[in-house]
């Protein structure tokens, strides 16, 4: 009879409701955890899909290279102060952003550091420390497709890429750094080849003009700067090299601490050399070393 009393029946009903609510709460918690796991899985799948798409994307398209040759070949060969060209948005931006991120995260311990009045920079040509996208972009820029493009653009036949990246690879200039105006070494002893062409690609997003860091191309007498090129993200500079192709970054970099000027550098060679007056092998010729 006691369970038939109104107050006791009410308490029993309340207990039942509380138990039902607790069960529903536990079920909702489980559903939320499942939803969180599904959301994380979805993001992982999307990230993997984007990564796969990036792997399928060419570093630079053959169509774009043909277009550049068609429209810029003559401009390249006639450009002052020596054959050169500046190409913006040159490689796939997504791939280059990944390269920039890899380079930013690298341990600089094994990099070569130069600290002289005419040259203050870091560099590495050690491919074993490159990230996967960095290795991929260097492979593409040393490929037959790209070397053929360079031959057609510049008119230099028989170009040979350097798998060892001698003097090239990754370059970095920190605040206060510089690279004096110079002409490059002309003979590559290891491969018995003559240096003919430089390709530089810059990694610097949101570069501020006030920081400086411009690449300067000087006249053949090393007296006057003819062209200044800001090192902005995805800008490529291609130019002929000889003992009169003076260039450099001669003014100390004025970027904030923690910022730096980063670039990819690749050099190309030939067996023959068209400059009979310059057949004596030499190292880098800095104008600061020459008598005034």
Q: What is the predicted function of each stretch?
A:
Residues 46-79, 105-119, 283, 291-292:
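Short acidic N-proximal helix/loop "leader" segments that mark the beginning
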């Amino acid at each position: 009879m006691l369970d038939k009393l109104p107050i006791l029946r009410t308490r029993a009903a309340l207990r039942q409701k509380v138990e039902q609510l607790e069960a529903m709460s536990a079920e909702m918690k489980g559903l939320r955890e499942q939803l969180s796991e599904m959301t994380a899985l979805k993001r992982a799948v999307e990230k993997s899909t984007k990564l796969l798409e990036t792997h399928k994307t060419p570093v630079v398209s053959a169509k774009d290279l043909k277009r550049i040759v068609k429209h810029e070949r003559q401009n390249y060969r006639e450009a002052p102060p020596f054959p050169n060209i500046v190409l913006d948005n040159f490689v796939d931006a997504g791939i280059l952003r990944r390269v920039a991120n890899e380079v930013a995260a690298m341990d600089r311990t094994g990099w070569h550091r130069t600290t002289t009045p005419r040259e203050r920079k870091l560099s590495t040509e050690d491919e074993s420390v490159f990230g996967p996208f960095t290795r991929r972009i260097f492979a593409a820029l040393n490929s037959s497709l790209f070397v053929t493009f360079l031959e057609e653009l510049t008119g230099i036949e028989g170009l040979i890429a350097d798998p060892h990246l001698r003097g090239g690879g990754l370059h970095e200039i920190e605040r206060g750094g510089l690279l004096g105006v110079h002409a490059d070494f002309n003979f590559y002893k290891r491969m018995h080849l003559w240096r003919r062409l430089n390709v530089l690609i810059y990694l610097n997003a949101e570069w501020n003009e006030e920081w400086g860091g411009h690449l300067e191309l000087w006249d053949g007498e090393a007296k006057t700067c003819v062209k200044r090129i800001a090192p902005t993200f995805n800008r490529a500079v291609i130019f002929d090299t000889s003992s009169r192709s003076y260039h450099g970054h001669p003014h100390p970099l004025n970027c904030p601490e923690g910022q730096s000027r980063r670039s990819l550098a690749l050099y190309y060679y030939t067996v023959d050399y068209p400059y009979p007056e310059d057949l004596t092998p030499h190292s880098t010729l800095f104008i600061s070393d020459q008598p005034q």
